[in-house]
Amino acid sequence: MAPHPTLKATFAARSETATHPLTAYLFKLMDLKASNLCLSADVPTARELLYLADKIGPSIVVLKTHYDMVSGWTSHPETGTGAQLASLARKHGFLIFEDRKFGDIGHTVELQYTGGSARIIDWAHIVNVNMVPGKASVASLAQGAKRWLERYPCEVKTSVTVGTPTMDSFDDDADSRDAEPAGAVNGMGSIGVLDKPIYSNRSGDGRKGSIVSITTVTQQYESVSSPRLTKAIAEGDESLFPGIEEAPLSRGLLILAQMSSQGNFMNKEYTQASVEAAREHKDFVMGFISQETLNTEPDDAFIHMTPGCQLPPEDEDQQTNGSVGGDGQGQQYNTPHKLIGIAGSDIAIVGRGILKASDPVEEAERYRSAAWKAYTERLLR
């Protein structure tokens, strides 16, 4: 049986065919950073979480969180932990994935997602769902995200400039006023002249001429379902990762279709139901948490993220059958070569392999390099 086309397509090419705007953005980010690594930041304090996000952010494309295990988590919409993570995501170029594993009736999971003390939807680009309660939970989460997004039908970006015109500018100003009335809307935005320039040569009455400054308001209107306008680093905005626009406001869902833990109950019927639910909600479901690619139909374009990834110690790093034992608590580990190169996943999720290293930043780079190598070798196979 021929491999699915997504296994041979580059991430850049898949960004062009993705059905979800956030998936398209993520593939672009992966291609730009040469990274398909997700850090599972399972740490006990908000301070540690923010520190890791800042230090390891350059190596990853996704940061996976468990907000409810973090002491010191604050929920202020502008200065809270989620808001600070969002700022670091902009700075270093990664998406935030809250590993909430919603698993209740539809009404309950929608409230957990859009409300409560944490307001997950406000700061997490991606969440996931356990399909045990059935497809209704996926539909309810999608509805909650849609209602949340409807509060932002478009972004209005406003800039105000105040200045005194030069003599050479009067002819151009006059032409522009003749061509377009103040406050007229054109294309992406509107430019309104609040105070017209007034130049008065009062030589006739013996008084000195004067110029009244112009206040100009510029507005740009942009759909939130599309990526935001690129910030120009040259203009001094260093808060956005260079080379790519800001992530869309659209929210995305990953369905927990398979697990890496020993003895889990996610059988073939469960996995198939997960795939069917994803196909029914392509406008919200980005893909899966799985152990292999689940793209089987020609139109399937889902992204796959896989936990349980670990490398042998560096001095023992060699190609094996891909298995690297377990942790004694049910977790089973495999190498990036097996998960991405052979099983066809797209993003390796790594936690303790990085967090427990003597130098987590250096180890994150080792995992990033190994996962990317597995992807590039898959393209050539």
From Swiss-Prot:
It catalyses: orotidine 5'-phosphate + H(+) = UMP + CO2. The keyword Lyase applies. Gene3D superfamilies: Aldolase class I. CDD domains: OMP_decarboxylase_like. GO terms for biological process: 'de novo' pyrimidine nucleobase biosynthetic process; 'de novo' UMP biosynthetic process. GO terms for cellular component: cytosol. Keywords: Decarboxylase, Lyase, Pyrimidine biosynthesis. Pathway: Pyrimidine metabolism; UMP biosynthesis via de novo pathway; UMP from orotate: step 2/2. The active site is at K101 (proton donor). The gene is ura3. GO terms for molecular function: orotidine-5'-phosphate decarboxylase activity. InterPro entries: Aldolase_TIM (IPR013785), OMPdecase (IPR014732), OMPdecase_AS (IPR018089), OMPdeCOase_dom (IPR001754), RibuloseP-bd_barrel (IPR011060). Its EC number is 4.1.1.23. Pfam families: OMPdecase. Belongs to the OMP decarboxylase family. It comes from the Eukaryota. Residues 311-333 are annotated as: Disordered. Substrate binds at residues 42, 64-66, 99-108, 333, 352. This is Orotidine 5'-phosphate decarboxylase.
